[in-house]
């Protein structure tokens, strides 16, 4: 889901430029899975962001998914060979098409970031927040008298009546308190006087106390006190655990272990909230030469109505947030940060939370349709898809370690699906699992704005963003970039034609990083002929991704900051997404034509299972 360009991978090997491959033409439409006309039933539609059809079928063939979640669909339901995403194969675009049944040319959501037609020339908008020009499933189902719950689905952010269901959980990217890594040296510890906090505490070395201060200055709950404890009676000073001085039972944290500690966090409304914080001891020298303590980012639940948010808290469910990509990247560069194990544990924990929230939601009685969302597989693809020797930092050992971590993430999703299916009555409910796109390895980032600046078409401001005087600029989302030309530019049509020729022919070191440059009209067969689309639409070549940062760095090509990306033309089989269904009204076997389902047919199939008409081309 995340348009993430936040971590820098250690550039252990020079990045290599791979040969360009022209993208094939868009595939012909495939038939939808057969809709039924049976009695209405309930439907649960869950998106596993970034789940590749190729990877799913390979893992199933290898017997690597053993928890029973995915297997239930293969055994009792429908599993498509692949689902054809809409273009571009980007998160916001495909999630909106999944819940509307329309391509970007009709929804108006043409990328994760784009320039909205009619707005001031330099204005851009997030595809996750932009107005949707067609009716969505939550609108359509509500209009027809049914109830809908939405758990984090892109576009359903409750910012206006058209973006609000009957109840739901809202997606949170920004923590109330940022994650923090505290490094304590031997000089940071001092003797702990005897008192109530140490009563009955057994240690075989002097008790020492230290403090960790996290969060923003002036915030409440920033300070944590710890004791260093030696629990081994070996006649040596050998500190082996940290004891947080918090309320409740004593919790000894050894290196490599997490603890769930009582803490206080200031909410965005400045009210102090008593909650629990996840804390991990990353390392602890026996002599306390260095101790590293990591604090997970802190979030509260954001759900509606208020009674549902309270229920989440009563059930002990607390939003944990996605894994800490930034500190993983810092660790990979040799700076203080987290390791791969910690990142994977965070990803598994968030998946567990979302699975528990889905089970709680399905246990409610006030719904006919539930939309759910899990980003773990996408996160692992972006951060861990190290398969190409041309990628920064590639070694076979690192490739294998990251592959093992990606498998663990798939297996954690498998466990949650199995637990979820055990709570659902499949005699009355159809469960549908989809994804928005697959993933491909990348090694080099392209910033097209550098090329436009070099042609004197873009003026960069002090923040290295397009500023006044710019006649052309790009927005980028992975494998796709939109080029916008000022409507007031002299001889505008000729300029667009010249830029098309330039981008199509541009090369570096004999390589062509841009596979295609299409005019908006030429993008019509790809479903992209909408006023929000760029005057030119660029698709990156194999191994390349578009991004920003070049205006500051001073060059158009840079080593990529992530290992996996999407956004390429949907006929690239690596971009193929998944479609699975099981339960009421679902005929076992392969759905679609020749095992292929289209993204834009999902909303209609869900509506048919509900006994309703599909979303309309224009909202009321």
Feature names for model-found ranges:
Residues 1-10:
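Bacterial N-terminal signal peptides that target proteins for export
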Residues 17-19:
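C-terminal motif of bacterial Sec signal peptides marking the signal peptidase cleavage site
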Residues 21-23:
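Bacterial signal peptide processing site
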Residues 134, 190-195, 199-290, 299, ...:
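Active-site neighborhoods of enzymes that stabilize oxyanions during catalysis
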């Amino acid at each position: 889901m995340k348009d993430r360009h936040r971590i820098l991978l250690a550039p252990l090997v020079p990045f290599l430029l791979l040969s360009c491959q022209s993208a094939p033409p868009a595939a012909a439409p495939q038939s939808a899975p057969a809709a039924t006309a049976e009695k209405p039933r309930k439907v649960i539609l869950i998106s596993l962001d970034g789940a590749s059809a190729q990877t799913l079928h390979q893992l199933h063939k290898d017997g690597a998914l053993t928890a029973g979640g995915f297997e239930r669909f293969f055994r009792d339901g429908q599993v498509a060979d692949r689902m054809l995403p809409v273009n571009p194969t980007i998160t916001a675009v495909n999630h909106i098409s999944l819940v509307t049944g329309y391509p970007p040319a009709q929804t108006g959501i043409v990328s994760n970031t784009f320039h909205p037609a009619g707005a001031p020339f330099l204005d851009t908008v997030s595809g996750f927040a932009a107005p949707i020009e067609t009716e969505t499933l939550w609108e359509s189902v509500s209009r027809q008298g049914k109830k809908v719950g939405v758990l984090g689905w892109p576009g359903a952010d409750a910012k206006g009546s058209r973006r609000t269901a009957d109840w739901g959980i809202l997606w949170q990217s920004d923590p109330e308190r940022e994650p923090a890594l505290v490094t304590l040296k031997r000089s940071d510890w001092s003797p702990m006087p005897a008192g109530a906090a140490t009563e009955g505490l057994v240690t075989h070395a002097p008790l020492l106390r230290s403090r960790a201060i996290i969060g923003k200055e002036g915030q409440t709950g920033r300070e944590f006190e710890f004791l260093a404890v030696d629990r081994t009676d070996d006649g040596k000073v050998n500190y082996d655990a940290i004891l947080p001085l918090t309320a409740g039972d004593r919790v000894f944290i050894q290196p490599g272990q997490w603890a769930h500690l009582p803490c206080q966090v200031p909410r965005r409304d400045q009210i102090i909230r008593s909650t629990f914080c996840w804390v991990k001891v990353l390392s602890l020298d026996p002599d306390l030469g260095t101790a590293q303590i990591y604090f997970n980012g802190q979030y509260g639940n954001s759900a509606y109505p208020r009674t549902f948010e309270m229920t989440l808290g009563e059930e002990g469910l607390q939003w944990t947030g996605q894994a800490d990509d930034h500190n993983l990247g810092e660790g990979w560069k040799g700076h203080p940060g987290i390791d791969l194990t910690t990142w994977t544990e965070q990803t598994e924990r968030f998946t567990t939370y979302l699975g528990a929230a889905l089970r709680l939601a399905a246990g409610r009685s006030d719904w006919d349709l539930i939309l759910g969302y899990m980003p773990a597989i996408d996160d692992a693809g972006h951060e861990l898809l190290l398969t190409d020797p041309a990628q920064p930092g590639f070694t076979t050992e690192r490739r294998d370690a990251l592959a093992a971590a990606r498998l663990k993430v798939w297996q954690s999703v498998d466990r949650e699906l199995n637990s979820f299916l055990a709570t659902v009555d499949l005699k009355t409910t159809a469960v549908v699992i989809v994804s928005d796109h697959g993933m491909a390895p990348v090694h080099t980032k392209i910033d097209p704005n550098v090329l436009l600046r070099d042609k004197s078409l873009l003026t960069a401001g002090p923040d290295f963003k397009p500023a006044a005087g710019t006649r052309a600029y790009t927005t980028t989302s992975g494998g796709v970039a939109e080029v916008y030309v000022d409507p007031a530019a002299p001889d505008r049509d000729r300029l667009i034609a010249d830029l098309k020729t330039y981008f199509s022919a541009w090369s570096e070191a004999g390589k062509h990083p841009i596979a295609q440059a299409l005019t908006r009209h030429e993008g019509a067969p790809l479903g992209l002929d909408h006023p929000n689309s760029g005057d030119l639409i660029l698709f990156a070549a194999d191994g390349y991704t578009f991004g920003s940062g070049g205006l500051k760095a001073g060059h158009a090509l840079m080593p990529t900051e992530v290992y996996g990306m999407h956004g390429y033309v949907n006929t690239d089989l690596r971009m193929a997404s998944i479609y699975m269904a099981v339960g009421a009204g679902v005929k076992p076997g392969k759905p679609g034509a020749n095992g292929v389902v289209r993204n834009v047919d999902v909303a209609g199939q869900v509506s048919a299972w509900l006994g309703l008409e599909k979303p309309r081309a224009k909202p009321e």
